[in-house]
Amino acid sequence: MSAYDVAPSFLRNSKRPISSISTTTRPAQPSSISVRPIPLIGDIEKGDDLFTREDFKLKPDFVNRPLWVCGDGRIFFEAGLFPEIANPVGEFLVAIAEPLCRPKHVHQYQITVFSLYAAISLGMSSEEILETLFKFSKNELDPKLTDYIRTHGSRIGKLRLVLRRRRYFIESPVESLIKTVEQFYKIHPHKLTPIEKDDESGIYSFEIDPNAVEKVKEAAYRDLQMPLLEEYEFKGDSDLPTIEMALRPTTKLRPYQEKSLHKMFSGKRARSALIVLPCGAGKSLTGITAACTMRCRTMVLTTTAVAVDQWKRQFEMFVAMDPNDVITLTADHKQPLPEDRPCILISTYSMFAHSIEHMSRSSAAVMQQVRELEWGLLIVDEVQVMPAKTFRQVATIVRAHCKLGLTATLVREDDLIEDLQYLIGPKLYEANWQELEEKGYIAKVQCVEVWCEMTLPFWSAYLNTSSGFIQRSLYTANPRKLTACEYLVRLHEQRGDKIIVFCDNISLLKDMARRTKKPFICGSVSMQERMAIIRCFQHSNRINTIYLSQVGDNAIDIPNANVVIQISSHYGSRRQEAQRLGRILRPKSYRDEDGFNAYFYSLVSRDTPEKEYAERRQRFLVDQGYAFTIISDFDARIDSRIADGEVFEYMDETVARSLLRQCLEGSDEIENETADVRVADSHTAVSDEQAERIIAQFSGGPAPAASGRVVSVSSLTGGSAGFYR
């Protein structure tokens, strides 16, 4: 079989022999779940082969067992060879270890003190973990590993952080443990009361300074390696009033959502936790169901004003409750909290980024209410944002009994992602993307990396400049890469697909949109214009391609989009790569002859840093089981099209010279759009006339008959009642 047979089927249908196009598939390679190295159990010498060491003893029936368990805590799971037990074994491993890499056949996990923290918080004991590992392991367990699990397992779960009437206490049934914590030099200065014993329960406790909660949790977690569990007996708490709310009868949870919530709740207790679900897999409904289960005062923290509006509308859609009990707090909407009843408050990270002294009077008044109240549940959307210095203080500003962190991409490019283990809690559930894809809960995506040669003028200029800024402009604006984009857009539009083209270079984004007569959205585009463009893309078959800058990375949900083409990006950001793929992960009802129904293209210039950035960006997706097909000779296909008379904008010499001049003049207009990442405003509506104008402008003709309805952002961000049926 030719290597080209792994490329999308519609790319294989060509006049050129398939043998003349070179492709390969980038294999899955295990990588760390964060930049900070995971603390291994013991040290492995460089070049040490785990499977030839003398202490690596195989059992006689090892061929019938699925796991290789190494002395340093690494576990290799032969999932492809044991499909009949893949699900229960996989669930066990996710509970006790960090998933490092889960391609189709062999999965890799790592046991750490922090994964044991998660396992024991779920009610598992050290002996249960060891017994199950021994049962499935091909080899005898290393004594070093068993001692490690027993030692840490005996301490984890014995220490709790409890919020009681706005005061924080550390509790433990073991006197020696709580004395160790109380006497630790980083914790002792923040102690407010001596250790006391409750004679009825036998629990020892002492109070700590509420302003030092983060420092105390960090010291217990990092230095003592004895994480403080945060659990809340919400059903027995008479101090917090309840909200009359319940899921509507038409709201149905998917099995993996139920599974994740089952791990968060145990009887009357709710555990603070992280839940990781892919984009488009229903993170919001998972959080809403948690709030309905607890029925207490709840805060939802998210990234943008649009996301605030989306959460509000989803509460109204999925939950039977008084709509007046759902309050929003944004820069443009500051509604005081009701004093006579509990509520659901939805706000943004940025609202908590400043001290009260620097807020407006109305903002300060609401924020003071937030600080003074005791919250039952804090839901943190896009939780990977929280460890940032600007936002992490919200974890202590909001005094919540229970915290739930939600994300699709538990990755950052700094060392801070691990801090979520003590800021929020352990990761109790992480969905397997490939499993959800196979069951149809998310789209089946084919990922393709297209290598493009630099044109001679651009390559010469690239070699003759020492400016990294100009070099980046040149390989980003490589005419052959832009021509490949133009070709792919034409190809997919002919197939009836809906295409998003991402480009972080704003001047290039505008130039491409203008020359190809497609609409674009970036930070300078008005809210009214953004809404009109998105509406037309959603509801008209005359607008099938839109160009987006990084404003489209978050808070945009276009369920019918099924193709992403990436021209430029933010260096090696794994998070951005996953978020952009997430734009096309909503489930689709159709598939091509190879079984795919969505396509993700990353276009890169050969022999430039762009190739290295692309490989770095793909690591998170590769760890989730995605394989990137690499087409290394795509330029030949373009040349054959040109020879047949097809015209491409950026292969015109005049256009290419103009683009080269812009790059050399340093007009790489990469705007800082972090302050304006809204794709649409929740209070903005679009008229039929505006939609017709957009369609006429970019389709070359009058618009088809409009629907006659005014569209709000909820319908444009996935807020449709049939979505979770």
Model-derived regions, located:
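A short beta-strand element within the Helicase C-terminal
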Residues: Y547, N554-S569, Y599-S602
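Post-DEXD/H (motif II) to motif III coupling segment of the RecA-like Helicase ATP-binding lobe
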Residues: G376-L377, Q384-C447, L621
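Conserved helix-turn-beta segment of the N-terminal RecA-like "Helicase ATP-binding" lobe
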Residues: V306-D332
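Walker A/P-loop
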Residues: G267-A290
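Conserved helicase ATPase core of P-loop NTP-dependent helicases/translocases
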Residues: K334-L337, K498-F502, S507-D511, K517-D553
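Conserved interdomain hinge at the start of the Helicase C-terminal
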Residues: L463-R514
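Conserved SF2 helicase motif VI
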Residues: L410, Y571-F600, R617-Q618
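Extended alpha-helical interface modules used as scaffolds for assembling large macromolecular complexes
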Residues: S2-D199
